Curated annotation (Swiss-Prot):
EC number: 2.8.1.1
A cellular component annotation (GO) from this entry: cytoplasm
Biological-process GO terms, alphabetical: glycerol metabolic process
Domain Rhodanese, first and last residues per copy: 17-105
Subcellular location: Cytoplasm
Gene name, Swiss-Prot/TrEMBL: glpE
Reaction(s) catalysed by this chain's protein: thiosulfate + hydrogen cyanide = thiocyanate + sulfite + 2 H(+); thiosulfate + [thioredoxin]-dithiol = [thioredoxin]-disulfide + hydrogen sulfide + sulfite + 2 H(+)
Purpose of the protein: Transferase that catalyzes the transfer of sulfur from thiosulfate to thiophilic acceptors such as cyanide or dithiols. May function in a CysM-independent thiosulfate assimilation pathway by catalyzing the conversion of thiosulfate to sulfite, which can then be used for L-cysteine biosynthesis.
Keyword Cytoplasm on entry: yes
One Pfam family cited in the UniProt record for this chain: Rhodanese
Entry protein name: Thiosulfate sulfurtransferase GlpE
Amino acid sequence: MDQFECINVADAHQKLQEKEAVLVDIRDPQSFAMGHAVQTFHLTNDTLGAFMRDNDFDTPVMVMCYHGNSSKGAAQYLLQQGYDVVYSIDGGFEAWQRQFPAEVAYGA
């Protein structure tokens, strides 16, 4: 895959539930602590190395940000690092929280 794909929150939720992909959140630490999707890895410059070490490059990665814009750049970056399949989640955490309020965790 040379280009990431966009995915809606319903499809992302299904892939996460079926363990077909991993979910990363690239928002700032304060926003992440105020609420994030359950089963999310907080991907930052500081945690990127650990994420790449602990996740297979053939496991699809779904990238979440605030509204679905910043995630596109991060998704493209992960492809360039060697991940085979990467998705950018349309609507970001804002859409996730609206559609799946019970699937939101709080704290770091």
